[in-house]
């Protein structure tokens, strides 16, 4: 028997297939970007990955991506710094922050008040299914 959650997920995938969301993933851990890329591409997302935030910014072009997944803690430039630089050139792209650390969303908002505009905050580990749900919700927000 198919559960209501499975039916909702199937409807989500139908909307993703129709839209073909373009996603940039930036995480210094190559295993994470590889797993997310494979999982999202299997669900009809168009995915570009970077393991270096400086390189990601240099390759970023306004309008090229619908959604960004940015790891918070990376060497060279953290996810918040990358987000601010990207927002200076494209204020329409939607972002989802990602972290493996225990800081709560509230702790980050205290340090980074601009996070009020951020609608998506994910903690590793996360399943591909949950990632897809959150990204579709973000895209439709």
Each model region followed by its residue ranges:
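Two-component/phosphorelay signaling modules centered on CheY-like receiver
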Residues: 30-48, 138
């Amino acid at each position: 028997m198919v559960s209501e959650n499975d039916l909702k997920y199937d409807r989500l995938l139908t909307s993703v297939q129709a839209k073909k969301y373009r996603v940039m993933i930036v995480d210094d851990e190559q295993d994470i970007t590889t797993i997310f890329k494979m999982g999202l591409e299997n669900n009809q997302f168009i995915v570009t990955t970077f393991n270096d935030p400086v390189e990601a910014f240099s390759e970023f072009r306004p309008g090229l991506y619908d959604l960004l997944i940015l790891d918070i803690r990376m060497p060279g430039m953290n996810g918040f710094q990358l987000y601010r630089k990207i927002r200076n050139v494209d204020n329409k792209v939607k972002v989802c922050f990602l972290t493996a650390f225990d800081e709560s969303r509230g702790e980050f908002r205290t340090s980074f008040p601009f996070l009020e505009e951020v609608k998506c905050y994910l903690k590793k580990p996360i399943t591909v299914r949950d990632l897809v749900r959150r990204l579709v919700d973000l895209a439709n927000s």
